[in-house]
């Protein structure tokens, strides 16, 4: 049994992202995993970081991460990034010195040392764009940024990334195939 912490970032309970969340939770629970789901919109998470020290909410989210084996992030990609509420959550929660620290090399130069080693991350993202455009013209920018610029810096190197393209334009049959991928991912987490 694994403890899975889900961070969900979509405002619409009838969105395809909600279907991903619900499918993942149902499948993982049937497999015997323990789920802890954070719905950023329902909890009215304030994504604005103004240099303040971590408050109770951020400290609670960090504790929930510490108690988990797997972090699952579910959100759409809008304008080649996740919604501001998710980006702000990353900025506030997965921040130094808690999630990573810098080891000084020389002068003002250092490199990050992750503090979340041994954890796994699973990222589910939906796109309105077709896969060809994202891979060709935008060089998988959202994927690389999350994998390298967020999770790897925090010490999480086991990152599974599942992307679903052109979601507003695909058939219901194709969406069901997407949800089968979600089920398989939940079974193999």
Feature map (PLM): residue ranges:
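N-terminal beta1-alpha1 ligand-phosphate binding loop
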Residues: 2-33
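Residues at the starts of beta-strands that form the adenosine-phosphate
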Residues: 3, 29, 34-36, 119-121, ...
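Short hydrophobic segments within beta-strands
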Residues: 7-9, 38, 124-126
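A short, flexible beta-alpha/helix-coil linker loop
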Residues: 11, 43, 127-132, 166-169
